[in-house]
Amino acid sequence: MSNTKSSSKDIIDHIAIVVKDIEQSINYYTHQFKCEVIFSDDTWAILQFENIKLSLVVKEQHPPHIAIIDDTISNDPKSKTHRDKSISKYILDPDNNFLELLSYNKK
């Protein structure tokens, strides 16, 4: 997400959907589709498809959202550093959909 004009387009890193049961959803998606589990715990999982990641999240822990790579947030005091050292913050679009701005650049 950049306000500067560039020839490259922004990248959607993942889409997060709310599920009732992480393990049950992992089983469904990995048997129904060709994807790989790259992380899972009790509150979320990440499945890697060929072109995008799908996050399965528990509603009480994570909102459904679209994550867009935005390396400009690395120095934003409102951003949060995660255990994998990625940095993110949530914003709302005009229709109150959650967007996660995400950077893999290390602080």
Write out the residue ranges for each language-model feature.
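N-terminal beta-strand motif that seeds the catalytic metal site of vicinal oxygen chelate
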Residues: M1-I26, K53, P64-I66
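Loop/turn position at the start of each blade in beta-propeller repeats
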Residues: D10, D42, D84-S86
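Charged, low-complexity surface patches
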Residues: V18, E36, K85
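Vicinal oxygen chelate
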Residues: I22, Q61-K107
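Conserved active-site tyrosine of GNAT-family acetyltransferases
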Residues: S25-T30, N96
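Short linear motifs in intrinsically disordered
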Residues: F33-I38, K78-H82
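Conserved short beta-strand elements that form part of the metal-binding/catalytic scaffold
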Residues: C35-I69, F98-N105
